[in-house]
């Protein structure tokens, strides 16, 4: 709390996460929330659950790669790969199109185990 009290933040949304590590070491690189920049927007992701073999069975095909070893960060990179084509114009994509990609992602990870996630794209949570 001291960190927050002593700093000035310019944001309407804050995401925090307390991790019970089930995959990957307890290190800074595996700490939630994960953040990546895409089209001048900060995309943020936190996840609870266990995704089984998701990170072994799925492939990352874009520029987003995990820094750590957690299934959560891998799944975030997978989601960003899927969303990237919508953000290529440099403007915020249509919300319905973004939600369609996110819904398909949620359906896919659901087949690997119980999980929930929080995702913000710099426009909506």
Protein language model annotation of sequence segments:
Residues 1-47, 51-125:
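Conserved short alpha-helical segments that host acidic/polar catalytic motifs at enzyme active sites
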């Amino acid at each position: 709390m001291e960190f927050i009290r002593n700093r000035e933040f310019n944001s309407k949304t804050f995401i925090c996460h307390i991790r019970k590590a089930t995959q990957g070491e307890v290190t800074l690189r595996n700490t939630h929330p994960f953040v990546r920049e895409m089209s001048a927007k900060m995309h943020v992701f936190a996840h609870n659950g266990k995704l089984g073999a998701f990170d072994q069975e799925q492939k990352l095909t874009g520029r987003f790669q995990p820094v750590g070893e957690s299934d959560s960060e891998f799944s975030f990179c997978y989601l960003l790969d899927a969303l990237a084509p919508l953000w290529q114009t440099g403007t915020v994509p249509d919300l319905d199109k973004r939600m369609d990609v996110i819904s398909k992602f949620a359906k896919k990870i659901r087949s690997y185990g119980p999980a929930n996630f929080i995702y913000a794209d710099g426009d909506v949570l």
